[in-house]
Amino acid sequence: MAKLYLTFLGTLLTCVLAFSQHKPDQKNASKDSTETANEYMHRSHTDDLIERFESPERDAYQKPEKVLDYLGNVLNKKIMDIGAGSGYFSVKLADRGAKVIAADVSDEFQNALKKRIEVQGIKNIELRKIPYDDPNLHDHEVDIALIVNTYHHIEDRSTYFSKVKKGTKGKGELVIIDFFKTEVPVGPPTGHKISIDQVIAELKEAGYSQFEVNVDLLPYQYIIKAK
């Protein structure tokens, strides 16, 4: 399957978010039905999560340079990285000349990223602590809202992404990267994953009407561009 392009008419879509890059925990698979994605992730210490997020093993399947190429020219574009975590994509976007808002609900992640920015002398990343239920975007603030491995952490997604849409410029887009809803070697338990069809249905409720879906670029994840 190359890319599929789907266009829909849509109307309207409160939230919990955090950030994941976990290998499935088979010993605790029985908890999948009751444990939330956020509870599952917070079994791990922040330092362990950062090490995992920034690992060569992640690079191998996340293919960040291919993802950035897929996003196109980001020079001088304002991009919010929702669930920025350790800054995995935020730093790479900044390296390509984007003006990045690295947004996260976690003080630990924000503090770690602040130190990284200072050490590396990065000038084009703004840290933004956000609440669980709001991306804290100003109207028409960004060209791109990027959310990687975090969509499945958000609970009231229709409401949350209607706010994201309001914060995106007229010709801007939302880009979602998350795990296929199947058994793969990385990511959260299958019960925490969200299917492509469900994502599109929820985004339609949030007011999005144009979708580009790529299932070939990454081995374990889909990419959805929405406007």
Spans of model-derived segments:
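A short glycine-rich, Lys/Arg-flanked "PGG" loop and its adjoining helix->strand segment in the class I
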Residues: 158-173
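A short acidic, Gly/Pro-enriched loop at the edge of an enzyme's catalytic core
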Residues: 135-144
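Class I SAM-dependent transferase core
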Residues: 22-72
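Class I SAM-dependent methyltransferase SAM/SAH-binding core
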Residues: 80-134
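Bacterial Sec-dependent N-terminal signal peptides
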Residues: 1-24
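Conserved class I S-adenosyl-L-methionine
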Residues: 175-200
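Core SAM-dependent methyltransferase catalytic element
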Residues: 212-227
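A short SAM/SAH-binding and catalytic strip from SAM-dependent methyltransferases
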Residues: 143-157
